């Protein structure tokens, strides 16, 4: 099946599901992360394609993003409140920071707004009666990543979190730790300030400093494709390309190129287009 055919299949199935559920005329707000984060462009492509079906059935879709990750939790809560105030009948949103998002989503649900969860926050769904969750099991994905790097000979894995406190990112690195341990290796977590998110130079310097401070680190796993680019640069600057194994969550052209030429060990994809389309 080609990707084009697959998209048609998904579109047909989604349309049928909407018609059966009676939800096809809803006004929906989709809330995602920073406008500076390229990951959300892939999610938005899925949202845009699904919007065509929603609009064809009399509904609307409003796409909202935070400006950055500096004040992430409060910004997300504000966007949830904004969506409710604007009359959204449904909100599709990841729940990265439950302490900020869950109360706002509970209030939205109590007001009759349907909640769809995607990308992060599967464990929080029951708190606001979310209809469904579209995304990966972050813990199992992390375990798989930790096991794979260890199976390739890594003994000490650095797991880099670019947005500390985000549930999905913390869960991924916990999985990496446990997966590495199961396979005879160890992993530790490097949390950097959220204002370094999307900062290639700052992130590369932070990774490089860790590698210099601890020469026993022989693998790095990042939780975003852009961060893997930053790590690749740090590793290259130290003359350790191929010596320090590199892995990441999410795909990009540069990630695939490094895997192809043997300078990156692995990547774990979470299908951002489908997350946006289905949510």
For every predicted segment, state its role.
Residues 2-8, 18, 23-279:
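A residue-level marker of the well-folded mature domains of exported/periplasmic proteins
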């Amino acid at each position: 099946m080609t990707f084009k055919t697959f998209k048609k299949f998904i579109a047909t199935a989604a349309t049928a599901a909407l018609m059966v559920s009676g939800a096809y005329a809803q006004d929906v707000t989709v809330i995602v992360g920073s406008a500076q984060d390229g990951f959300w462009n892939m999610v938005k492509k899925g949202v845009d394609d699904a919007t065509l079906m929603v609009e064809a059935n009399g509904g609307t879709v409003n796409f909202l993003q935070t400006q950055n990750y500096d004040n992430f939790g409060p910004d997300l809560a504000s966007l949830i409140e904004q969506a409710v105030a604007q009359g959204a009948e449904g909100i599709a949103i990841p729940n990265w920071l439950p302490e900020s998002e869950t109360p706002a989503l509970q209030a939205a649900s109590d007001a009759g707004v349907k909640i769809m969860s995607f990308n992060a926050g599967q464990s929080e769904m029951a708190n606001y009666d979310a209809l469904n969750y579209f995304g990966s099991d972050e813990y199992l994905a992390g375990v798989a990543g930790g096991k794979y790097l260890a199976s390739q000979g890594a003994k000490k894995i650095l797991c880099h979190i670019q947005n500390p406190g985000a549930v999905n990112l913390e869960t991924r690195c916990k999985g990496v730790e446990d997966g590495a341990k199961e396979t005879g290796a160890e992993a530790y977590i490097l949390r950097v300030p959220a204002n370094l998110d999307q900062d290639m130079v700052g992130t590369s310097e932070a990774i490089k400093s860790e590698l210099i401070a601890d020469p026993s680190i022989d693998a790095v796993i990042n939780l975003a494709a852009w961060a893997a680019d930053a790590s690749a640069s740090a590793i290259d600057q130290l003359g350790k390309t191929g010596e320090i194994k590199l892995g990441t969550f999410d795909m990009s052209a540069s990630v695939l190129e490094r895997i192809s030429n043997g300078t990156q060990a692995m990547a774990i994809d979470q299908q951002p287009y489908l997350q946006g389309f289905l949510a």
